[in-house]
């Protein structure tokens, strides 16, 4: 039989190991760096027998995204073997590769400790040094159940009973460990060259709070020790930038068990930051032709039933009873916007209608996934819904994409765009999907925006563009979304009268720019390590006196800068200047303005930046102009205007 390898046609025999076939077509160095292969696009072990109907083979390199996922999956198996060796009574459950690492969940009588993790990692290194082969066998399900029953692995039995269809299962073995697994895996344990266990946490079996609590051990693995070292450095840097730590340090927000999980309490400085962002959003939306609207926090259950949320989303909603009627606390803002559109007769001349709301929403997130500002139960969403004619769709999408570019750039982020297309289960005609997808593509291409295609990952009601921010540690964060929707206009019977007098259905776009304001602020704090841009800093400048002799002059300078719209405060404590400077730097204040005898005599202030740079003595007018210009600079790129200095 003939197979194609990198545009070469090669003679091969059915049943021959795929790795053996590849060895005749690629260099030994590349083969040595391979961890698996693709058979007609499907990932397989290098030892996988070549099917007689195979057409194409390709290597999976260790440092490729797929290769790293396979290495991490194999590392999870190696970890499970180590845990079973050290703690024989443990039960194993599942151990997948995840983004940037892997985990395995174990049922054990007590939590694992940091000392346990060290011992487990040392045991893993023994297996890796032994270079044990991974082997795959296919056995009758009944035989596999007998094997795991004899080992007391009740979770594996449940998986086979509830999740595996068919009479045959695949088992992977290495060393003394056998696991139920689809694979693929690296050829030998020695190819897991760089591995590190990171942490342990509780996790409910199948994510169900009513099921047993398991012990989840997280780890990561890379193709090289250098890559692992870089990643571990990023983890340490991320700890320093943790928004929860910085939020407390900068006195921005807090969480309290007395209030409840996932509910943030905003302190004065944090609320000021929010207010500045929200005021900016309102003004920018008005400037770009949106109408500001507001809907109620709770709506009758019948509306959620009509929209489909009750059937598809109610587990994430909160409900309450009022006057013997059921109400849902809104998890999103769209329903009120539908009713605003429907409140009057619409002509084609009235379109587009753009409704914007900074709406507070509530979603019942599981307690195990709550994480500071990044995952909360109450948050504010910068929601907008655009209803337009089909011929206006591309222009509207282009406008939203440009809006996203301007706002993301203002906050200093780079970003990536991803197009999610029609899934297998969807509503709407082929014509609707083709038109909407083309409009999304044309909008991005018209402004030269690169994008990746995520086939089949659109919502059942329409395709979408997802914008993922790249932060200072090269992490990706989902924030902005532009979503076509064929469902709600139909369910709410939204129409307009066309030029020919016919009733037509408008096209609808859901979109958010920042997404959840809380989540965005959490990302921004970590991106900037708390050193927010000057325009957004709750305190933009602090005047520091050297002795009481400068206090009267400093108070005059304070009043002058406040008149100029600067958010400034005075530190007139009887402390050493160095202490005051360090404290201001810890608080991430952009400008430290020192008032000593020399500055008092000259009628100015010595300007120091939080970076440590000293700009020398400036007059009060120069200081005011400098800080104002610093605030205005980021806005110029998007043709926007800064006017939030005097909050």
UniProtKB/Swiss-Prot annotation:
Domain TGS span(s) in chain numbering: 1-60
Chain's gene name: thrS
First-level EC class: ligase
Organism, scientific name: Solidesulfovibrio magneticus (strain ATCC 700980 / DSM 13731 / RS-1) (Desulfovibrio magneticus)
Any one Gene Ontology cellular component term annotated for this protein: cytosol
Pfam families (alphabetical): HGTP_anticodon, tRNA-synt_2b, tRNA_SAD
Matches recorded under InterPro entries: aa-tRNA-synt_IIb (IPR002314), aa-tRNA-synth_II (IPR006195), aa-tRNA-synth_II/BPL/LPL (IPR045864), Anticodon-bd (IPR004154), Anticodon-bd_dom_sf (IPR036621), TGS (IPR004095), Thr-tRNA-ligase_IIa (IPR002320), Thr/Ala-tRNA-synth_IIc_edit (IPR018163)
Cofactor(s) the record lists: Zn(2+)
UniProt xrefs under HAMAP family: Thr_tRNA_synth
Top-level taxon in the UniProt lineage: Bacteria
Name of the molecule in the record: Threonine--tRNA ligase
Similarity remark: Belongs to the class-II aminoacyl-tRNA synthetase family.
Span list, region Catalytic: 242-533
